[in-house]
Design a protein with these regions (language model features):
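Short carbohydrate-recognition loop motifs
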Residues: 48-66
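Short, aromatic/His-centered strand-loop micro-motif at the edge of beta-sheets
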Residues: 127-150
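Flexible glycan-contacting loops in extracellular carbohydrate-active proteins
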Residues: 172-199
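Secretory/extracellular carbohydrate-interaction modules
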Residues: 61-125
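Extracellular beta-strand elements of beta-rich domains used
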Residues: 36, 201-205
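Bacterial N-terminal signal peptides that target proteins for export
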Residues: 1-9
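Short tryptophan-centered beta-strand motifs in secreted/extracellular beta-sheet-rich domains
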Residues: 36, 80-82, 146-156, 160-162
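Extracellular carbohydrate-recognition regions
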Residues: 25-45
Length: 207
């Protein structure tokens, strides 16, 4: 997520939000599916990542952002879904996100939700953040500690559609990479004192 006070205008058009209901990942062909029974799914393994017992966990230090683009799969048109679980206990301000239209760790788009009931869309370009949609309230987000939320991005051509728990949020027109792109996960810890852990239960990609 964009983590600076100043916001930079992004030359993309965001269409009006809707309340259309839609099932997750409706494509006919499953391109990728990971329920995290092992760590062989092509994710970047480092000290901030823990994959075991059917979960993908991002360990988040205070005031930390962790992103993880899948290394071994490249897609074009794709429907991406993931289940994110807020940690139990006293909540810190936390964000969970899907990455799409990714080239590398310096260039990708991010769709995320906060455990305060807001969502955002941002772009990282040449290592710099640009906010597209900034922290919009959305009642479909489950905010309770331990609650699960399903995030979905359906990217077709130059249009991406965003869903939270089956409810369509909005569309976005942009410029995807020309020769395929990568997808991934992200976690944001906005507490400046407490560390935490964000868990994802699955990732599925269809076309």
């Amino acid at each position: 997520m964009f983590r600076q006070l100043g916001f930079v205008a992004c030359a993309l058009v965001v269409l009006a939000a809707t309340s259309v209901r839609s099932l997750a990942c409706e494509g006919n062909e499953v391109i990728f599916e990971d329920r995290f029974s092992d760590d062989a799914g092509g994710w970047a393994i480092n000290n901030a990542v823990e994959i075991k017992d059917g979960t993908f966990a991002l360990k988040l230090a205070p005031d930390d952002l962790e992103t993880n683009l899948n290394v071994t799969f490249t897609v074009e048109d794709a429907d991406i879904c993931s289940e994110a679980v807020w940690p139990e206990g006293d909540p810190v301000t936390l964000g969970a996100g899907l990455l799409f239209w990714g080239v590398d760790n310096k260039d990708y788009f991010q769709f995320g939700i906060l455990n305060s009931g807001k969502y955002w869309i941002a772009r990282k370009q040449d290592g710099k953040w640009r906010t597209i949609v900034e922290n919009i309230d959305f009642s479909a987000i489950n905010t309770s500690p331990g609650a699960t939320n399903t995030l979905r991005v359906k990217a077709t051509g130059n249009t991406a559609s965003f869903y939270i728990n089956g409810t369509k949020v909005r569309d976005l027109r942009g410029q995807p990479p020309k020769s395929g792109w990568r997808f991934g996960l992200s976690g944001d810890n906005f507490d400046k004192e407490k560390e935490t852990k964000l868990v994802f239960k699955s990732v599925k990609v269809t076309n």
